[in-house]
């Protein structure tokens, strides 16, 4: 609070802003957002981490923090709405173009790209990237800092008020995955120390909902393809999985195997260049780019030609 608080806030902003000389500590916030699909994936997956953290801080015993976070959650909800519907409309456009062209094989990538839409395997690769980067935002699976914050009443668990326990966790345990002898195992850890792990599990469950809706779009279009979340150890830079290479199915693989197959799991420069080639502006009301379907309804149920922004010249 006061002058000390302002100084600390300025230093926090400096640390968080990032630059070429001092990049942000977390990879998700160093990743470029060169196209709309990247933006939609960021708002769906990375902003969802913000939702989980804000929900936990909304349980704080420090009332100003709790009330502030509850207000901020309304903004996060809109971010994730933009992300889910944006990715969904991209998938819808691809499905419609494939059906119109009579293409049934989702892996006929060149033919699908020639239609001016983004092929489904590339969308899956973008999903893999942003999901795995977002998992790193939860920090170490076992954390004394998280335990201390919980004990101090600064931060609770996700939807703490719905959990039916003593809310002290003194003698409780929680399952945490570990790497032992080059195998993934599950160990029971003190629940207090596994606060981050539990929050990450809640995130995974929450994030899966959008994938189910995207897959229903493909099912209605009779396209044999389904989006999946990769294993939580895939492409990780923070936590117990960071020292090893793990494929999307959860198998520990060698560095050479990773190097030879990473391009089939994560977007390449050529994938990015193709997506960028589709990013052409449309200036007329009701006109949409080839790679994205029109929205079902406008924001706040407004018509397609509604002027959301009005410019008044002085």
Give the ranges of each region predicted by the language model.
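Acidic/His metal-coordination segments adjacent to aromatic residues that form catalytic metal sites
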Residues: 4, 9-42, 104-141
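Glycine- and acidic-residue-rich phosphate-binding/metal-coordinating active-site segment common to enzymes
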Residues: 60-127
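Internal, conserved structured core segments that host functional sites
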Residues: 31-83
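Structural signal for well-ordered, non-membrane alpha-helices
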Residues: 55, 77, 81-84, 88, ...
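Short alpha-helical linear motifs
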Residues: 2-6, 90-98, 150-152
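Long, hydrophobic, amphipathic alpha-helical segments used as structural scaffolds
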Residues: 58-61, 84-87, 91-94, 142-145, ...
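Extended, helix-rich structural scaffolds rather than catalytic motifs
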Residues: 99-314
């Amino acid at each position: 609070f006061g002058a000390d608080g302002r100084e600390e806030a300025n230093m926090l902003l400096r640390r968080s802003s990032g630059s070429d000389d001092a990049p942000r500590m977390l990879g998700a916030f160093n990743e470029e957002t060169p196209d709309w699909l990247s933006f939609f994936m960021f708002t769906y997956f990375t902003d969802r981490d913000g939702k989980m953290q804000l929900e936990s801080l909304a349980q704080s015993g420090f009332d100003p923090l709790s009330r502030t976070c509850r207000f901020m959650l309304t903004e996060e909800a809109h971010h994730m709405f933009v992300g889910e519907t944006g990715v969904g409309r991209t998938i819808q456009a691809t499905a419609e173009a494939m059906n119109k062209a009579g293409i049934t094989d989702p892996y006929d990538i060149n033919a699908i790209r020639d239609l001016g839409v983004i092929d489904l395997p590339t969308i899956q690769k973008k999903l893999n990237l942003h999901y795995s980067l977002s998992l790193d935002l939860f920090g170490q699976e076992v954390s004394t800092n998280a335990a201390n914050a919980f004990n101090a009443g600064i931060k609770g668990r996700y939807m703490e008020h719905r959990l039916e326990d003593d809310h002290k966790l003194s003698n409780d345990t929680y399952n945490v995955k570990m790497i032992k002898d080059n195998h993934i195992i599950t160990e029971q850890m003190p629940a207090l120390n596994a606060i981050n792990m539990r929050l990450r599990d809640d995130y995974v469950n929450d994030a899966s909902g959008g994938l189910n809706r995207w897959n229903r779009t493909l099912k209605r279009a009779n396209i044999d393809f389904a989006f999946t979340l990769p294993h939580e150890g895939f492409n990780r830079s923070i936590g117990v999985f960071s020292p090893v290479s793990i494929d999307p199915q959860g198998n520990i693989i060698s560095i050479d195997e990773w190097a030879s197959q990473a391009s089939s799991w994560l977007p390449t420069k050529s994938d990015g260049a193709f997506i960028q080639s589709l990013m052409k502006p449309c200036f007329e009301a009701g006109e949409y780019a080839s790679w994205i379907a029109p929205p079902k309804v406008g924001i706040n149920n407004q018509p397609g030609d509604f002027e959301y922004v009005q410019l008044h010249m002085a």
